[in-house]
Amino acid sequence: MKIAIAGASGRMGRMLIEAVLNDADAQLVGALDRAGSPFLGQDAGAFLGKDTGIKLTDDLDAVFAQAEYLIDFTRPEGTMAHIAAALRHDVKLVIGTTGFTAEQKAELQAAAGKIGIVFAANMSVGVNVTLKLLEFAAKHFSHGYDIEIIEAHHRHKVDAPSGTALMMGEAVAGALGRSLDDCAVYGRHGVTGERDPSSIGFAAVRGGDIVGDHTVLFAGIGERIEITHKSSSRVSYAQGALRAVRFLSARGAGLFDMQDVLGLR
């Protein structure tokens, strides 16, 4: 599997490079970084004390010409440029970027008509199994329980609520036969009045080096149920991304997520 990594100098990019280098079935063939990055020209394995012979570059076409797959955990504007390059070079994509606009998501979906794409806000096995648990719980706590989603991430995260929190909200809302767009309440402030019993509330915490904590609270009278997932390392995301690459190796064009990859549908 000839794999290139986007955002190669970032925290997730470094973890992905390490995962690819340690996988006997994978070959690192490219490492992309943003234009103007101070790390351009540096060996992709320098962060690990290894010499890979692959230099960090901002030349999209040069990297895509060598790759069969690109793993992308960057930002929406970067990912959209990567999608365009992938279409030019017929490269399959594993995308963990969050914060897309509706228009950008539509472009991503259109691209999946020509190339294989796995798009998931969270690629850990644990989170995706948790989504199934939430669907089950929501169906049984549909009356008399208020639903709130609390997430916490490191100080550098730029979007809120997290993509994973939104995935959890969509799983719960879908199980209840609702649209998250219609029932979500984000970041209450001031005099808000009584809680709408059909709403799903979101709260976001940012600080320190928190990798990612998510709790869905079902609060009833006399009891509450909390379903929590906590990430202590980005290793689970990197391993999930490689699992997604393997999944795409046996697929043609189409848009998939980790529920497809893990056979949880």
Swiss-Prot record:
It comes from the Bacteria. HAMAP family: DapB. It is found in: Cytoplasm. Pathway: Amino-acid biosynthesis; L-lysine biosynthesis via DAP pathway; (S)-tetrahydrodipicolinate from L-aspartate: step 4/4. Its EC number is 1.17.1.8. The gene is dapB. One of its GO terms (biological process) is diaminopimelate biosynthetic process. Belongs to the DapB family. This is 4-hydroxy-tetrahydrodipicolinate reductase.
